Amino acid sequence: MRALICESYGPIAQLRVREVVTPAPGPGEVRIRVESAAVNFPDALIVQGLYQVKPALPFSPGAELAGVVEAVGEGVRHLQVGQRVISFCGHGAFAEQAVVNARQVVPMPEGMDMDTGAALLLTYGTSLHALKDVGCLRAGETLLVLGAAGGVGLAAIEIAKQMGARVIAAASSEDKLRLCREVGAHETIHYTTEDLRQRVDALTDGQGVQMVCDPVGGDYTEPALRATAWRGRYLVVGFAAGAIPKVPLNLALLKERAILGVFWGDAVRRDPAAHLANLQQLAAWFAEGRIRPVISERVGLDGARDAIQRMAARQVQGKVVVHPHA
């Protein structure tokens, strides 16, 4: 089978598509024919050795997929050969076949296509966990989303609207802000031409926002934290800007602000029941037409490396989906 392979930690450019042996599932595992796999920012980090998890070399990147079960390992009871499934696998999705721990695989909701299934899990799962489980977003509150045209940001906009919140989307270009408005943002901030804190003050009558969802980090973290209201919550979701920011902790003290970390991947492992409940909620919203992943591009396996590079350079809006068999 063909797979995009990382043979040593380093630049994304060294990734190559190789012919490799088709793996067999072990006990508690399933092998999936990958029909669609989505590109996410952690893919860029993991191949450079910069992510929290470092797979044994060589490996294929790709954290989420949709496909069809082709083989079932010993002890697997809830999945059958031929079943359409989705999986948050962590790595291994950019390949024609993937062997995955069966506990990380769930049946695909009725009416969902492969591309949507692949694009839903990580970004929407992260955003729902962040806003509901960690941040406890309430109806009527105002949420500021940084990096709002990325996968997590767009998902956060849609989910926050379903939760009854007002959404302010911040992004770095007018094209990105236009997309944010299309998916439901109430207000937008062009944070390369506007002062983030001043604009938030103007949009909230000087009160600040109750919550910030930040998958970006970098230079906008401190002004966004300063723009939170009394007892506001700041969700640390990721560091797409590259730099991990350092902020004065007196900012937390002054308005009793809470700085909350969001590690969805580990939360899935620690509380699978909560993860399943969130997936069921996402599936229901999708079936009702309330959420819809923005898929900006589809590429074959030979285009996956370039897609990861563009993701790292923050040149992607929404999600890029890889079709390994194209």
Regions found by a protein language model. Give the residues of each.
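Mid-domain Rossmann-like dinucleotide-binding core that forms the NAD(H)/NADP(H) cofactor-binding site
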Residues: Q80, A118-E194
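Short glycine-centered segments of the SAM/dcSAM-binding site in methyltransferase folds
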Residues: R84, T142, R166, G232-R233, ...
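C-terminal capping/lid region of NAD(P)-dependent oxidoreductase domains
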Residues: A283, E288-E297, R305-A326
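Glycine-rich beta-strand-centered segment in the early N-terminal region that forms part
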Residues: V21-A38, L50-G92
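Glycine-rich phosphate-binding loop and adjacent beta-alpha segment
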Residues: D219-I291, H323-A326
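NAD(P)H dinucleotide-binding glycine-rich loop of Rossmann-like/cofactor-binding domains
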Residues: R33, L45, R84-G147, E182
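Short, glycine/polar-rich helix-capping loops at beta-to-alpha or helix-loop-helix junctions
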Residues: A93-E96, A171-L179, I244-L249
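Short amphipathic alpha-helix with an adjacent loop that forms part of the alpha/beta core around
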Residues: D195-G206
